[in-house]
């Protein structure tokens, strides 16, 4: 016969907290990083020919240099396209400016086509033109120190018709002279943009480099490498290497702590997380430290860490786990709603929502001994004794320490004289 027990299900938060969702410090690795290089070609008034002096400008020379780099290293660079946006300043007739802007578009595109041909580099050139660049005009005007700036801005807001705008602005004789020398020349232009990607190492290349010499990898590549395996030992090895190569980065320490929590190595987890916190006191680290505190039964300390993890993606789950520990079961179930974890199921059991608990347990991603144990509790509380014994047998087969807990758990009181139950817990 089993000795008189106590209702022990509520104390299981110490165990379920260990397989709650931890938070890893994510890598920022990108295989392809979007880049762009811009240049500007300026034109003389009413002209569309590209002057040699413009091709010698720093911006154009830098753009050509980037095109050469892309051509010479197509493993590291990948061109997307080239954009050409040509403009005419907003003086003169709309018809004339439309034709002028189009000619500027064509002349700048022709220059690029020649450069690409000489380099034997393929790229799409997307072109467009704006007949009268009123937006650019307004932007430059607002940033200027022109005396009549506010008056001209009011004219722009009062008149939508381009030709009427020009008439009104020309009436400001002194103001227009300043515009003609300071603003309008800047609008007679074509903007060239090379869009390309910086290409990083592939998954296979990162893994190969890790094996040959991990020190050659960036911290982002190392952290990313850990995501390429599901094996916990391999992850730990990569994170340990990362702490050696990049000791100032908190993420690898934090992630080692997260793995240690899942493995039930709380002292090891505490050590890693303490080191992580010394590098950066952030939500991810505090979330994991809260779970350790809950697993150790230190509710007050857990509450402190939870309060410092408000931006964590698992904040609601942390609050739910904390409320289970504090005995606020209805609030806990509400905070954990939708979380497919043992803690969520525990909260639902303690809030006596057995249907929800059963559904949650059937959807736990990495079901373990505690999942089976909680299934046994649900079955026992709903009068399904045979199912309770079956699930309890599965739980004890995975974690023999649950024998002692089951033997004293009054949720199984109706089984205390059941021979199958007695054989399981003896």
At which residue positions do the language-model features occur?
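N-terminal targeting segments with Sec-dependent signals, encompassing both cleavable signal peptides
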Residues: 1-375, 379-394, 400, 404-408, ...
């Amino acid at each position: 016969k089993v000795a008189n027990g106590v209702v022990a299900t509520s104390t299981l938060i110490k165990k379920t907290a260990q397989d709650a969702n931890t938070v890893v410090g994510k890598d920022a690795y990108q295989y392809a990083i979007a880049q762009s290089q811009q240049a500007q070609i300026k034109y003389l008034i009413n002209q569309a020919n590209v002057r040699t002096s413009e091709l010698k400008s720093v911006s154009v020379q830098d753009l050509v240099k980037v095109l050469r780099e892309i051509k010479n290293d197509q493993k590291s660079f990948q061109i997307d396209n080239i954009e050409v946006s040509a403009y005419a300043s907003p003086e003169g007739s709309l018809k004339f400016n439309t034709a002028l802007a189009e000619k500027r578009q064509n002349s700048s595109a022709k220059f690029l086509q020649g450069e690409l041909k000489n380099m034997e580099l393929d790229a799409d050139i997307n072109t467009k033109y704006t007949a009268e660049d009123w937006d650019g005009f307004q932007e430059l005007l607002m940033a200027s120190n022109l005396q009549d700036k506010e008056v001209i801005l009011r004219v722009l807001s009062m008149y939508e018709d381009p030709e009427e705008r020009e008439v009104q602005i020309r009436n400001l004789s002194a103001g227009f002279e300043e515009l003609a020398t300071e603003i309008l020349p800047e609008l007679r232009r074509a903007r060239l943009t090379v869009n390309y990607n910086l290409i990083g190492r592939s998954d296979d290349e990162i893994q190969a480099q890790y094996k040959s010499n991990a020190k050659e990898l960036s911290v982002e590549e190392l952290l990313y490498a850990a995501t390429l395996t599901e094996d916990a030992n391999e992850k730990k090895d990569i994170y340990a290497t990362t702490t050696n190569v990049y000791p100032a980065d908190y993420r690898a320490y934090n992630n080692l702590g997260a793995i240690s929590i899942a493995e039930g190595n709380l002292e090891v987890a505490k050590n890693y997380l303490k080191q992580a916190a010394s590098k950066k006191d952030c939500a991810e680290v505090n979330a994991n430290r809260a779970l350790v505190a809950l697993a150790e039964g230190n509710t007050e300390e857990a509450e402190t860490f939870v309060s410092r993890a408000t931006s964590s993606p698992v904040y609601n789950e942390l609050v739910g786990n904390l409320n289970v520990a504090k005995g606020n079961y209805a609030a806990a179930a509400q905070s954990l709603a939708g979380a497919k974890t043992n803690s969520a199921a525990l909260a639902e059991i303690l809030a006596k929502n057995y249907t929800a608990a059963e559904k949650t347990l059937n959807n736990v991603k990495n079901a373990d001994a505690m999942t089976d144990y909680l299934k046994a509790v649900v079955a026992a509380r709903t009068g399904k004794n045979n199912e309770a014994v079956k699930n309890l047998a599965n739980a004890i087969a995975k974690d023999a320490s649950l024998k002692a807990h089951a033997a004293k758990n009054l949720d199984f009181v109706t089984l205390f004289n059941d021979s199958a139950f007695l054989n399981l817990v003896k």
